[in-house]
Design a protein with these regions (language model features):
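Basic, amphipathic alpha-helical/coil surface patches used to engage anionic, phosphate-bearing ligands
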Residues: 1-368
C-alpha cells in the first residue's frame, strides 16, 4: 500500500498549489458551516496506517472549519476516488480533479441546490420521465438508489433540465444524505448502491443515447467512484446482448462492480438490505418500474415519495434566501467525454443497430 499512499500524498501536494477559487470549491465554506473540526483520515483498503503522515493538504481544516463542498470532511477518500478513476496515475488524477473543480466553479455547482426547477408541474414531468430515487439503505447504511433505465424517456423537458435535476440529486446525496449516515453509523460512508431496472428496455432507447451519455459523462468526470455496486435487474435480451460486447471494454475495477441478477433480484438484494429498502420493482417478479410515477408514495421515482418531497422542498427553501426565483433551466456545460467512454457508446449504438436489423426493424429502433 506504500505506492498508493505515496500517490495520495503527491496528489495532495499538487492540489495544494491550485488557485484559491478552486481550492475553496474543493474544501469548505466556513461562514456557512461553522468552525474548526478536524478531518478524519479514512481507512480505505488498508491505507490508513500509510496515510498518517499525509498532512500538508489536510491541515487546512484548521483554517476552513467543518465539511462543506466536494470532500465533505474526507479529503483522503476524495483523492483516492480520483486516483482510482485514473488507475493511480497521479498527473492524470490531478488533471481530472482540477478540470472537475473548474467545471464546478464555471457552472456554479456549489449553489445548484438553490435553483429549483419550476413550476412544480414541470418538475413532476421530469420525475415521471427521469426515473431515479432513493429507495432506502443497505444493512451497512449505504444509500440505495433505484434507477428505471428501461422506462426513462427524457421527453418532457429540455436536456438542460434533466442534467440540472440529476446534478441536484448528486449534490444532495453528497452534501446531506452521505454525511447524515456517516454520523449515524460513526464511520465514513461516501458511496452508494444503484439498482438499475431494465424493464421496458427497447431498441428505441437509442433515441435517448445523447442525454444518457451527457449525464453519465458528468458523473464519470466529476463524481467518480461514487457508486460501490451496480445491480442489474429485470434484464431483457437486448441488455444481455449489449452487455456481452461492452463488458470486455470496461476496466476490471468497473466490471467487478456490476452484478446482473436473476429476474427482479429480490432474494439476492435481501441479503444486503431489508425489505423496506427494496426498490418497488424488486419486491415481486414482474413488478418492474412504473412508467408514470405520479401519485404513488411507495414508488421512489415519484415526486410524492418522501425523498423527492424532501429534496424539492429543501431546494425551494434555499432559493427563498437568494434573489427572486427565476424560471428556466440552468445551463450546465457537459464536459468532453473520455475517449474510452466514447468508444463504449459507439459499440452500444452499433449493437443496437445490429439487433434492429436482426429483428427486421427498418430503422433498427422499434423492437423490444
Amino acid at each position: 500500500m506504500a505506492a498508493e499512499a505515496s500517490a495520495v500524498q503527491q496528489l495532495a501536494g499538487l492540489l495544494d498549489q491550485v488557485d484559491a477559487p478552486l481550492k475553496k470549491t474543493f474544501e469548505l465554506n466556513q461562514h456557512e458551516y461553522g468552525s474548526k473540526d478536524k478531518f478524519t483520515v479514512v481507512k480505505v483498503d488498508g491505507l490508513a496506517d500509510s496515510l498518517q503522515n499525509v498532512t500538508l493538504f489536510f491541515d487546512l481544516s484548521h483554517t476552513f472549519g467543518i465539511p462543506g463542498n466536494v470532500h465533505q470532511g474526507y479529503p483522503t477518500e476524495t483523492l483516492l476516488r480520483f486516483l482510482k478513476a485514473r488507475e493511480w496515475h497521479v498527473n492524470k488524477a490531478h488533471r481530472m480533479l482540477e478540470d472537475s473543480l473548474n467545471w464546478r466553479m464555471q457552472n456554479e455547482i456549489d449553489s445548484i441546490l438553490e435553483k429549483p426547477i419550476i413550476p412544480v408541474d414541470l418538475y413532476r414531468s421530469i420525475r415521471d420521465t427521469q426515473l431515479i430515487g432513493l429507495s432506502g439503505y443497505s444493512k451497512e447504511g449505504i444509500p440505495v438508489f433505484a434507477v428505471g433505465v428501461g422506462l426513462s424517456t427524457y421527453d418532457k423537458a429540455s436536456v438542460n433540465y434533466y442534467v440540472q435535476s440529476h446534478i441536484q440529486i448528486n449534490e444532495y446525496r453528497d452534501r446531506f444524505i452521505l454525511p447524515t449516515v456517516t454520523k449515524k453509523y460513526g464511520r465514513p460512508i461516501t458511496t452508494c448502491i444503484k439498482v438499475l431496472d431494465m424493464t421496458g428496455l427497447k431498441l428505441s432507447a437509442l433515441h435517448q443515447m445523447k442525454i444518457v451519455t451527457a449525464i453519465s459523462t458528468v458523473d464519470d468526470l466529476n463524481y467518480p467512484e461514487k457508486t460501490e455496486t451496480y445491480y442489474i435487474v429485470n434484464a431483457p435480451y437486448i441488455f444481455s446482448a449489449c452487455w456481452k460486447v461492452v463488458k470486455p471494454l470496461l476496466q476490471e475495477r468497473t466490471r467487478k462492480k456490476v452484478h446482473v441478477l436473476r429476474g427482479c433480484g429480490r432474494d439476492e438484494l435481501l441479503q444486503i438490505m431489508d425489505y423496506s429498502s427494496l426498490p418497488h420493482f424488486c419486491r415481486q417478479e414482474g413488478s418492474g418500474s412504473s412508467k408514470h410515477s405520479s401519485g404513488d408514495a411507495d414508488n421512489c421515482f415519484s415526486l410524492d415519495h418522501p425523498f423527492h418531497q424532501e429534496l424539492y422542498s429543501f431546494i425551494q427553501e434555499q432559493a427563498l434566501n437568494q434573489e427572486l426565483i427565476k424560471q428556466g433551466s440552468l445551463h450546465v456545460k457537459i464536459p468532453e467525454q473520455d475517449p474510452e467512454d466514447a468508444k463504449i457508446v459507439e459499440v452500444i449504438e452499433a449493437e443496437f443497430h445490429k439487433l434492429g436489423v436482426q429483428n427486421g426493424s427498418a430503422n433498427g429502433i422499434d423492437q423490444a
